[in-house]
From Swiss-Prot:
InterPro entries named among the record's database cross-references: Aldolase_TIM, TAL/FSA, Transaldolase_3B, Transaldolase_3B/F6P_aldolase, Transaldolase_AS, TSA/FSA_arc/bac
Organism the protein comes from: Pelobacter propionicus (strain DSM 2379 / NBRC 103807 / OttBd1)
Name by which UniProt lists this protein: Probable transaldolase
Pathway(s) annotated for this protein in UniProt: Carbohydrate degradation; pentose phosphate pathway; D-glyceraldehyde 3-phosphate and beta-D-fructose 6-phosphate from D-ribose 5-phosphate and D-xylulose 5-phosphate (non-oxidative stage): step 2/3
Keyword Cytoplasm: yes
Alphabetized Pfam families for the sequence: TAL_FSA
Subcellular locations according to the entry: Cytoplasm
Gene coding for it: tal
């Protein structure tokens, strides 16, 4: 399973990369705005840290506009993946970009049928948002299971990126279901290695070591 980090904070990306956990990066307009820096400057710095897929999102809402923006985005670096919203116009853009050999990540997916449409349009990645579904009392991980089953049934090669990850259980369940990728906030990524018994064990080892004659 691959781990992407879901942030535009270069410090977080660098620190997670040093842990050996980062296979790629997902950004969005909200994350870029939060960084307080220029869009292209942030993306270029990210590509210098992580040698893997870097998702950068279009802003246009019409297919021709999305295609134009996508063609500019991929000029930044060969690892750029264009994030496209799950809309009819987004599907048109995805199909056209796929035909041009431009990788796409169809985002804001909230149903397994939306993921199926994105795969049929030629999406490289599909990004279902599990946390936001959980927020409205729907089963976020349930749609990951449905998408995995459908893609396996019909041989779709689009990779499933589990997005809107809120906790380590989301990551665990994604792995058990067989999702290709989880894109994880830095705060959650740090939680993955934590267990109280690990901390207690280290504390005991250190205490025992103090009793060893020096």
């Amino acid at each position: 399973m691959k781990f992407f980090i879901d942030t535009a904070d270069v410090r977080e990306i660098r620190e997670a990369h040093e842990l050996g956990l980062v296979d790629g990066v997902t950004t969005n307009p909200s994350l870029i705005a939060k960084s307080g820096r220029k869009f292209q400057e942030v993306i270029q710095e990210i590509t210098s840290i992580v040698d893997g897929p870097i998702s950068a999102e279009v802003i246009a809402l019409d297919a021709p506009g999305m295609i134009r923006e996508a063609e500019e985005l991929v000029k930044i670096h060969a690892n750029i993946v264009v994030k496209v919203p799950m809309t009819p116009e987004g599907l048109k853009a995805t199909k056209a970009l796929s035909a041009k050999g431009i990788k796409t990540n169809v985002t804001l997916i909230f149903s397994s049928l939306q993921a199926l449409l994105a795969a049929k349009a030629g999406a490289t990645y599909v990004s279902p948002f599990v946390g936001r579904l959980d927020d409205i009392s729907q089963d976020g991980m349930g749609i990951i299971e449905e998408i995995r089953t459908m893609f396996d049934n019909y041989g779709y090669t689009s990779e499933i990126i589990v997005a809107s990850v809120r906790n380590p259980i989301h990551v665990l369940n994604s792995a058990l279901i067989g999702a290709d990728i989880a894109t994880i906030p830095y705060s959650v990524m740090l939680q993955l290695s934590k267990h109280p018994l690990t901390d207690a064990g280290i504390k005991k080892f250190l205490a025992d070591w103090e009793s060893v004659p020096k």
